[in-house]
Amino acid sequence: MTKIILTDIEGTTSSLSFVKDVLFPYAREHLPEFVRGHRDDTEVKRLLADARAYAGGDLDEEALIERMIGWIDNDQKITPLKALQGLIWEDGYARGDFQGHVYEDAVAHLRQWHQQGLRLAVYSSGSVHAQKLLFGHTAFGDLNPLFEAYFDTRIGGKRDTASYKAIAKELGVEPREVLFLSDLRAELDAAAEAGMKTTALDRAGNGEDFGPHPVARDFAGVGV
């Protein structure tokens, strides 16, 4: 019996284009000024130190900014960078520069499942902070009350089976009691290997090969 629905964000609850065409370019454009303006903030200072350590060199501020922009351009899932992006997006949401995109069908079914007593959680490569910002600033209002837990790369990579086992343990359930939703087969494979149930979201309807995983065009097609 399914007790928890664990959902991805990009390409699943939300448009890939929102992340790639709105959020990433916004963070890239505003990263230099944000770092220069907040370098002495305790959290930013810690994240910059973590990013510098990850880069493996004693980079000065401008070189580090350039390196991080390169990471953004290559869509690298680096934890301190993701956290910095989240802080930049927080400013953007607060200024009303954009709203978090969530598909209407996703909102309707997340609300329905929540009302039915199903527990809901999120697992995305974006930081937990960024996840909460996206769901907190949508055209449908603040959706965060629907979710009980959020997971990012701090628990492990999304293509690693161990990550899904760790999530189930954190949620206090057996993996078989979790239904994972994603648009990427490698993530679905890892979740299934951990023992979770899975459904692939094929919003583009491209007939992508999702192998043994059930496929839905939108949340209305997800069987729980």
Curated annotation (Swiss-Prot):
Gene Ontology annotations of biological process type: L-methionine salvage from methylthioadenosine
EC number: 3.1.3.77
Reactions mediated catalytically: 5-methylsulfanyl-2,3-dioxopentyl phosphate + H2O = 1,2-dihydroxy-5-(methylsulfanyl)pent-1-en-3-one + phosphate
UniProt-listed InterPro entries: Enolase-ppase_E1 (IPR023943), HAD-like_sf (IPR036412), HAD-SF_hydro_IA (IPR006439), HAD_sf (IPR023214)
CDD domains, alphabetized: HAD_EP
Domain of life: Bacteria
Cofactor binding note: Binds 1 Mg(2+) ion per subunit.
Cofactor (UniProt): Mg(2+)
SUPFAM superfamilies membership: HAD-like
Pathway: Amino-acid biosynthesis; L-methionine biosynthesis via salvage pathway; L-methionine from S-methyl-5-thio-alpha-D-ribose 1-phosphate: step 3/6; Amino-acid biosynthesis; L-methionine biosynthesis via salvage pathway; L-methionine from S-methyl-5-thio-alpha-D-ribose 1-phosphate: step 4/6
Gene Ontology MF, one: 2-hydroxy-3-keto-5-methylthiopentenyl-1-phosphate phosphatase activity
Classification via Pfam families: Hydrolase (PF00702)
Keywords: Amino-acid biosynthesis, Hydrolase, Magnesium, Metal-binding, Methionine biosynthesis
Keyword DNA repair: no
Alphabetized NCBIfam families for the sequence: enolase-ppase, HAD-SF-IA-v1, HAD-SF-IA-v3
Family: Belongs to the HAD-like hydrolase superfamily. MasA/MtnC family.
Function comment: Bifunctional enzyme that catalyzes the enolization of 2,3-diketo-5-methylthiopentyl-1-phosphate (DK-MTP-1-P) into the intermediate 2-hydroxy-3-keto-5-methylthiopentenyl-1-phosphate (HK-MTPenyl-1-P), which is then dephosphorylated to form the acireductone 1,2-dihydroxy-3-keto-5-methylthiopentene (DHK-MTPene).
Subunit structure: Monomer.
Stored HAMAP family: Salvage_MtnC
Name assigned to this protein: Enolase-phosphatase E1
Organism: Thioalkalivibrio sulfidiphilus (strain HL-EbGR7)
Lineage: Bacteria, Pseudomonadati, Pseudomonadota, Gammaproteobacteria, Chromatiales
Gene this protein is translated from: mtnC
